[in-house]
């Protein structure tokens, strides 16, 4: 490592995480699935804090996919209540730490109460200049691309653009998170090795890190390990976890 600036520049700018394994972790403890989801919130706190210390620009957490509605009705209901509780209890802490919260996905299917909480949380943190935290809720990569295609088709029909004007850049500008760097590191917990319809366009060139840890077990050290792997894979710097941790106190 030539200098700390080169090291800092080698960090991922946008980390996406598929937080998998809450239910299996709970089952291994002889607990109901919702117990795992609640413990998963602690892992979110630790991971967000660690990423912010590192100076990561954006983090996107896959909280609830558009396919998750197929889960048992009771579990979905409990997840929605947990979402409301977390938004209510955590948003002031995020705001205090200058973090910006966004919820991406089709929120129209959520209850009015949850939609209101989302709007309040986004409005409170909208002017913050620290790390952007995207919560992907009722989100799917195919949905994201479809919505962009519909928006462009409408503009073409209205004469605002020509069909021949449509290119990759224009599509990118009509996706969610268009103002953020593309994902350069995807982390998925629980040992599963697939992307599950998550940010299909934005992860075109991402490095993908799969760990056997269940999400409730994921913590600061887990993130440091993933980031160290990314730096060594992407930049061939031969850095260590200790060097990554040192950055947390230097930011």
UniProtKB/Swiss-Prot annotation:
Entry annotation: catalytic residues: 20, 68
Co-factor note (free text): Binds 2 magnesium ions per subunit.
PROSITE patterns cross-referenced by the UniProt entry: UPP_SYNTHASE
Catalysed reaction equations from the record: 8 isopentenyl diphosphate + (2E,6E)-farnesyl diphosphate = di-trans,octa-cis-undecaprenyl diphosphate + 8 diphosphate
A biological process from GO: polyprenol biosynthetic process
SUPFAM superfamilies noted in UniProt: Undecaprenyl diphosphate synthase
Any single GO CC term annotated in Swiss-Prot or TrEMBL for this entry: cytosol
Annotated EC: 2.5.1.31
Cofactor names: Mg(2+)
Binding of Mg(2+), residues: 20, 207
Record's keyword terms, sorted: Cell shape, Cell wall biogenesis/degradation, Magnesium, Metal-binding, Peptidoglycan synthesis, Transferase
GO molecular function: ditrans,polycis-undecaprenyl-diphosphate synthase [(2E,6E)-farnesyl-diphosphate specific] activity; magnesium ion binding
Binding-site positions, substrate: 21-25, 33, 37, 65-67, 69, 71, 188, 194-196
NCBIfam families membership: PRK14830.1 (NF011405), uppS (TIGR00055)
Family: Belongs to the UPP synthase family.
Biological function: Catalyzes the sequential condensation of isopentenyl diphosphate (IPP) with (2E,6E)-farnesyl diphosphate (E,E-FPP) to yield (2Z,6Z,10Z,14Z,18Z,22Z,26Z,30Z,34E,38E)-undecaprenyl diphosphate (di-trans,octa-cis-UPP). UPP is the precursor of glycosyl carrier lipid in the biosynthesis of bacterial cell wall polysaccharide components such as peptidoglycan and lipopolysaccharide.
PANTHER family found in the cross-reference section: DEHYDRODOLICHYL DIPHOSPHATE SYNTHASE 2, DEHYDRODOLICHYL DIPHOSPHATE SYNTHASE FAMILY MEMBER
Subunit structure as annotated in this protein's UniProt entry: Homodimer.
Protein name stated in the entry: Ditrans,polycis-undecaprenyl-diphosphate synthase ((2E,6E)-farnesyl-diphosphate specific)
